[in-house]
């Protein structure tokens, strides 16, 4: 009797595939662990620096003990004895690591111009730095007042312009004015701070010319006078009339430039506006003529000003300085009497003890 052939179990192949899968995963895990262990014994790429860069092409990882070499970037110079190499340490760090060995390329140091001075704004003259020029009083600048140290394509530093110069200040004659003149009309060139004075010509008409504006001009800069010249013109303000009031200054029939008028209201009226007006350059009163309104003057809502008369100062209080003097005298007298009483009490006590 022969045994029946065994029927293959359909689950066996699945077990083989599962064991094969576990075997593959183990190989992958060992490879990953090996890779991680190898990477754990390496340094990452060194950090970038502003002044220096790697001499060779950077790599993703570096072995322990591996040495890298740096070089200064364009626009920087090597400063001995700082090292330009770094070593991958067992703790996965780079030592030493610093860009102190590379300094910026410097421009040539600039000298002070004649009658002027150069100021280093940033306190240095390497590329990126700026300088500012100034001239002495009585001199003006020709050229750029601010220069900057820049870098060209070859890595060399240069100033972006030529240094300026300081020239002596001169002024051409000031402008002539209509109906007037100025002093020193025969001078063709004026030095720094030299001045002229303007005046008006006599007017053949009934009203005189008034000098409106500054009477004196001086040479303030190269071909620059201190202000615009004045004008000579007729300025005539209308006769000021104040209803329910009167002038308290001298009365005149004509009021020319800068004539001053003071006003006062009649009894039973109060003034609204300024009590003083001046004849302005446009033949009008400045400020406008006030008004005198009937009735008592309204009380001001503003707090009293102590500096004005009629109000006590904070130190005076309600009773004033006289009351303060009485208080001081009373304190002095009281103190003297108190001392005398104490002395008498002490004397009586000593006599009582002797008895």
From Swiss-Prot:
SUPFAM superfamilies: Complement control module/SCR domain
Domain Sushi residue range list: 43-104, 105-168, 169-234, 235-294
Membrane topology value: Single-pass membrane protein
Sites where a glycan is attached: 179, 301
Source taxon at top rank: Eukaryota
Disulfide topology: 107-149, 135-166, 171-219, 200-232, 237-279, 265-292
Annotated transmembrane regions: 327-347
Disulfide bond found in the keyword field: yes
Primary subcellular site in the record, as a coarse category: membrane
Keywords annotated in UniProt: Cytoplasmic vesicle, Disulfide bond, Fertilization, Glycoprotein, Membrane, Repeat, Signal, Sushi, Transmembrane, Transmembrane helix
InterPro entries linked: CD46 (IPR017341), Compl-Cell_Adhes-Reg (IPR050350), Sushi/SCR/CCP_sf (IPR035976), Sushi_SCR_CCP_dom (IPR000436)
This protein's name: Membrane cofactor protein
Gene: Cd46
């Amino acid at each position: 009797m022969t045994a029946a052939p065994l029927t293959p179990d359909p689950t066996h192949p699945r077990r083989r595939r599962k064991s094969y899968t576990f075997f593959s995963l183990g190989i992958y895990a060992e490879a990953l662990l090996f890779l991680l262990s190898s990477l754990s014994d390496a340094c990452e790429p060194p950090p970038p620096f502003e002044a220096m860069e790697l001499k060779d092409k950077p790599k993703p990882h570096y072995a322990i003990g591996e040495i890298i070499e740096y070089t200064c970037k364009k626009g920087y110079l090597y400063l001995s004895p700082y090292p330009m190499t770094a070593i991958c340490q067992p703790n996965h760090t780079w030592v030493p690591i610093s860009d102190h060995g590379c300094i910026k390329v410097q421009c040539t140091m600039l000298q002070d111009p004649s009658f002027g001075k150069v100021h280093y704004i940033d306190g240095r003259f390497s590329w990126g730095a700026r300088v500012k020029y100034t001239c002495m009083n009585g001199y003006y600048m020709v050229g750029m007042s601010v220069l900057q140290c820049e870098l060209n394509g070859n890595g060399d530093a240069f100033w972006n312009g030529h240094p300026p110069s300081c020239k002596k200040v001169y002024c051409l004659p000031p402008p002539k004015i209509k109906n007037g003149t100025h002093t020193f009309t025969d001078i063709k060139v004026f030095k720094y701070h030299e001045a002229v004075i303007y005046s008006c010509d006599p007017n053949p008409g009934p009203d005189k010319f008034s000098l409106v504006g500054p009477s004196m001009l001086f040479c303030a800069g190269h071909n620059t006078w201190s202000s615009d010249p004045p004008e000579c013109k007729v300025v005539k303000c209308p006769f000021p009339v104040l209803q329910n009031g009167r002038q308290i200054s001298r009365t005149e029939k004509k009021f020319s430039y800068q004539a001053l008028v003071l006003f006062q209201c009649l009894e039973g009226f109060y003034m609204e506006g300024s009590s003083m007006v001046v004849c302005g350059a446009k033949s009008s009163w400045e400020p406008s003529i006030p008004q005198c309104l009937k009735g008592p003057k309204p009380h001001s809502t503003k707090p009293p000003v102590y500096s004005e008369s009629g109000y006590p100062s904070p130190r005076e209080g309600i009773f004033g300085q006289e009351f303060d003097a009485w208080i001081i005298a009373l304190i002095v007298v009281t103190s003297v009497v108190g001392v005398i009483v104490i002395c008498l009490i002490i004397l009586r006590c000593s006599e009582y003890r002797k008895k």
